Structure formats: C-alpha cells, structure tokens
UniProtKB/Swiss-Prot annotation:
A molecular function (GO) term: rRNA binding
HAMAP family: Ribosomal_eS4
The protein's name: Small ribosomal subunit protein eS4
One Pfam family cited in the UniProt record for this chain: Ribosomal_S4e
Organism listed in the record: Bigelowiella natans
All copies of domain S4 RNA-binding, residue ranges: 42-105
Lineage, top ranks: Eukaryota, Sar, Rhizaria, Cercozoa, Chlorarachniophyceae
Length: 242
C-alpha cells in the first residue's frame, strides 16, 4: 500500500541555498508547496532563525509567524513552511523594516534591507507565454504568476518589474545585448554580468557571452540568467549587493 508523500526533511539531504548546521539535529523544516521549488528555496522558519535572529528554536520561530506581523511579497504570511526564494520581499510593518532575498557572492540566499518604496516591487522572469485569444496573452513567470496582457512586446526570457499586491506590470526588461543579468545557476551563481553577445548554436540553443564587472568573460545558457537592469544599471537598489 502506498504511503504517499513524505512529510519530513532531513538536514543532510536539504538543498544548499543556505548553510545548515547539520550536526545540531537530524531533521529540517520541510518546505510546503508554493510559488518556488524546494531546490531553489528555503522555508520562512529558517529565514527567521538564520538572518533575523528572532528565535532560538523552531517553536519560537513558529510563534513569530503566527503573530501575523510578518508580510511576504506584500501579503500576510502565517505558514512557517512557506517557500522563500530569490527576489522575494519580507516586511515587518510595525518596525518599518523591509528586506529583499538575494544571492550572496558565495551563491547562497541572504537578505538585504531595502527602502519602503521597493517593498512591493519584485523582478520576475518570463518562462512561458500562452495565446489566450487573438489579442490577449497570458504570461507565466518563474514564481507561477499568471499575468494577462494585450500586447506582444514581451517575450520568453525577459524580466518584469511587478507590484506584488495587484500583479501590475510596472516595467519590462528585455533580454538583449547590454542588459544587466544575475547568474542564478551554475559555477558563477550570484555573479552580476552584462550581456555582450547572444549566439545561436546548431542545436538551436542560445549561448550568452557575458562580461563581469571586473572585466572577466564567461558563457552561460539563457535559463541560467535573470535580467535585473539595463545599460549596466540595476532597476532595483543593489548597493549592498554590488
């Protein structure tokens, strides 16, 4: 007889997006289903314990979440298992503190404090476009948002700056030469680079030639990149990151 999906997660088999102290215990908080995959995200409970230091153990961290004073992407979050990943925002309105989840230079998830003006803004990558009718199209982003548009200027691999409260598209970032990108996968995870050339191969895959801030060059696939700005300038504040 089938046992169904496992409801536990061991520390030794957890993803490597943040560093876990694997000798302090056997089990880790299992991420619930949500907008991010378990490979690229961590639970809200681990974020509270590791980065905000609001709790010493899991029981205290769960109580912090249940108070209802914590917002994720502009919406109240009451689940300590909620998946948190790249570009998500975490807010504490009572303390007037707002943070964004980014990749450190070591390729691990970390949080940086942001201004109040950016607390409801997020960069999402377009992964699929569906033709709903002759004029309207449905855009699916990397965090599983479905956005309806009536123009065809947006393409797959582009990025969108959206308001998380009402899913309004504020600005579209094109995937083209000169765009500023964040590498989200592979050896250079967490590195910022500029697109210098987009070359098609015989297998119809696009190989992207990039140049880092220090002048070093590298090559990546389209799926490994997230456009975050234009003309070497990020559309969101990354002063602590760069």
């Amino acid at each position: 007889m089938a046992k169904g999906i496992k409801k536990h997660q061991k520390r030794i088999s957890s993803n490597t997006m943040i560093k876990y102290k694997k000798k302090l215990g056997i089990f880790n908080t299992k991420i619930s289903s949500g907008p991010h995959s378990k490979v690229k995200s961590v639970s809200l409970l681990n974020i509270i314990k590791k980065f905000f230091h609001l709790a010493d153990n899991n029981q205290e961290a769960q109580k912090v979440v249940k108070t209802g004073f914590l917002y994720v992407n502009g919406k109240k979050c009451l689940s300590h298992k909620f998946p948190i990943s790249l570009m998500d925002t975490i807010s504490f309105p009572l303390a007037n503190k707002h943070y964004r989840v980014l990749l450190s230079k070591a390729g691990k998830l970390t949080v940086y404090e942001i201004n109040q003006n950016e607390k409801d803004l997020k960069i999402c990558k377009v992964i699929k476009i569906i033709n709903a009718s002759s004029k309207n199209k449905i855009i699916i982003t990397d965090d599983l948002r479905e956005l309806k548009i009536n123009y065809a200027k947006i393409k797959v691999e582009d990025s969108l700056l959206i308001k998380t409260i009402n899913d309004e598209i504020v600005y579209a970032l094109k995937f083209e030469v000169g765009s500023l990108c964040l590498i989200t996968r592979g050896k250079h995870l967490g590195t910022i680079a500029v697109i210098k050339e987009i070359r098609k191969t015989k297998s119809l895959r696009k190989m992207i030639h990039l140049e880092k801030i220090d002048g070093k060059k590298l090559t990546k696939k389209c799926s490994d990149l997230l456009v975050i700005g234009e003309s070497k300038t990020s559309i969101l504040s990354l002063k602590h990151y760069i």
